[in-house]
Design a protein with these regions (language model features):
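N-terminal amphipathic, basic-rich helices that act as targeting or association modules
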Residues: 1-15
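Tryptophan-centered motif/residue detector
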Residues: 66, 73-75, 110, 145, ...
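Conserved, non-catalytic sequence blocks in retroelement Pol enzymes and Pol-derived host proteins
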Residues: 112-114
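Transmembrane helix-loop-helix hairpins at membrane boundaries of multipass inner-membrane proteins
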Residues: 11-107, 116-120, 195, 200-231
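Alpha-helical multi-pass transmembrane bundles of energy-transducing inner-membrane proteins
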Residues: 12, 16, 22-28, 124, ...
């Protein structure tokens, strides 16, 4: 399994069934800590080992639009949706900081009583956040973005301190509204892009691939054209 995908999915190992977590008891703390440390070690190794694993690519010489540890496989081919991940010199520090903060958070809240729920939620949030940083597909980015909000909502609702129920309600309203607006934006980008940008096998001829859309936007801007063509100009 590719390294980036392994780091993302490691965070979800602790999210077993509630009954299994209850049987694990205090062990869930240790399991969560080990998983978070494994994610940190893998991420750190990816920085120092990039030139050996990726050949000539290095973090200091990456050009715009180039990614280390890039991996892509079909997810929903008919719609041009792929499980596509990669890291550049901007996203890697964010991923590393996330994997660094996970074990710090677990150690700092080690004595949390409801550990069977709390620690898996923390790992789920961390894994989804990493997915946001490494996603090279707009649909995949949106899915991971939504996955960060679910554990955050329950963490606020249960461990948010004073007036946490009101805070969780506001969090839900704001994030739900923002998610709908973001979804409308992604759908707009998808349907207003010219056909033919996608790989073979899609029904619509369109794509969610971020590098492809970025390259098309640069080419369109260089030619003095709007990124999404005349359709967007009519809307504006």
């Amino acid at each position: 399994m590719p390294l980036i995908s392994s780091i993302v999915l490691l965070a979800y190992v602790a999210t077993v069934s509630p009954a299994a977590r209850e049987r694990m008891g205090p062990t869930i703390r240790l399991v969560s800590l080990v998983l978070s440390l494994a994610m940190l070690v893998l991420t750190t190794a990816m920085f120092f080992g990039s030139q050996y694993i990726e050949g000539t690519l290095d973090w200091t010489t990456l050009s715009f639009g180039s990614f280390n540890y890039e991996y892509s496989t079909v997810w929903i081919e008919s719609l041009g949706i792929y499980w596509s991940v990669g890291m550049d010199a901007l996203s890697f520090p964010m991923v590393w900081l996330t994997t660094f903060l996970l074990p710090v958070t677990i150690v700092a809240t080690w004595n949390e009583k409801n550990a069977a729920v709390y620690f898996p939620l923390v790992l789920m949030m961390g894994g989804a956040l990493i997915g946001v940083f490494v996603a090279l597909d707009l649909f995949m980015f949106y899915v991971f973005w939504e996955l960060t909000l679910i554990p955050m909502f329950f963490l606020i609702l249960k461990w948010g301190g004073y007036d946490r129920k009101y805070a969780s309600q506001k969090f839900f309203i704001y994030t739900f509204t923002a998610s709908v607006i973001m979804l409308l934006g992604l759908v707009t980008v998808y349907f207003l892009q010219p056909e033919g940008l996608s790989r073979a096998g899609t029904w619509t001829g369109r794509t969610f691939d971020i590098p492809t859309l970025t390259a098309h936007a640069q080419a369109a801007n260089a030619g003095g054209a709007w990124f999404l063509g005349e359709s967007l100009q009519k809307i504006l």
